[in-house]
Amino acid sequence: MILLDTHVALWLALDPGKLSRLAVSAIDLAQAEVLEIAISCVSLYEIARLAHRGRVELDVPVEELFDQFNLRFSIRDLTPAIALLAAQLPSSFPGDPMDRIIAATAMVEGIPLITADQRIRRSRTTKTIW
């Protein structure tokens, strides 16, 4: 299983050319081996918020995009273990709560996070692919 950061899920749906070769390879391998590709439930919130504020332009209504995501991805819930770990990440980790929850999800699940976010990758708190 792999976990996609919010922007990676959006790019995969809307503009796959923005993905790195390594990210595409990891996603293709997961699909070929019938492994789960997951996103955090907070990514849905982030996407809905971005669409509502006009910061991302979707080809389809956000509800339809979420229907596509439900078919394509495993949506990972925010559990008490994830919430606790997100709150306990070191202060050197980026402070954005959504980033912390997404990284903690990868850590609790024991899976790599596909992200272009250099702050998360530099923190080395979780295994990342980019």
Predicted regions, residues:
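Short acidic-hydrophobic, aromatic-tinged amphipathic segments that line or gate anion-handling sites
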Residues: 76, 128-130
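A short acidic, helix-capping loop that chelates divalent metal ions and anchors anionic groups
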Residues: 10-12, 48-50, 84-87
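Alpha-helix capping/helix-boundary segments
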Residues: 8, 43, 82, 102, ...
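Active-site neighborhoods of divalent-metal-dependent phosphate/nucleic-acid chemistry enzymes
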Residues: 59, 70-116
